[in-house]
Design a protein with these regions (language model features):
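Short helix-coil junctions and helix-kink-helix linkers
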Residues: 56-64
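Short boundary/linker motifs that mark transitions into or out of structured domains
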Residues: 1-30
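DNA-recognition element of transcription regulators
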Residues: 29-37, 63-82, 97
Length: 133
């Protein structure tokens, strides 16, 4: 799956990378960072609790979650996005609850492209002939 962030950063979940489309700069992400960012982007606008993140990003893959680990991964993602030129705070901390993607950030995904793009209907318009008799 691919997400575009602010129109110039692409996050490719298969490649586990963030790419600035304007400069070509690329940052490789760890598997855990990729799962975390994917989770946040898929539920953008919603607050994802720490407990849900622990389960879906860490425990499900055999890793032991902790608040310290999670905070470190969030910090790394924020730094990576800033290094690629995003000036907005993309990942918002909701104190004592969890995290969410800022509603001010423009995010599009593969699903958004496929559902919003439709091919135009083509009609066979034959040239009109006027007969002058």
């Amino acid at each position: 799956m691919r997400f575009d962030i602010e129109g110039f950063i692409t996050f490719d979940t298969e490649e586990a990378s963030l790419v600035n489309l304007l400069t070509g700069d690329c940052i490789e992400l760890s598997a855990t960072s990729t799962r975390l960012l994917t989770n946040l982007l898929q539920y953008r606008g919603d607050i994802i609790s720490r407990v849900d993140i622990f389960q879906s990003v860490f425990e499900k893959y055999g890793a032991r979650p902790s608040n310290s680990n999670l905070n470190q991964y969030i910090s790394t993602l924020r730094r990576s996005l800033a290094d690629l030129g995003i000036e907005k705070n993309v990942i918002i901390t909701v104190p004592r609850i969890g995290f969410k993607i800022s509603e001010e950030v423009i995010i599009t995904s593969d699903n958004d492209y496929s559902s919003s793009f439709t091919l135009p209907v083509l009609t066979a318009d034959l040239p009109q002939r006027s007969l002058l008799w």
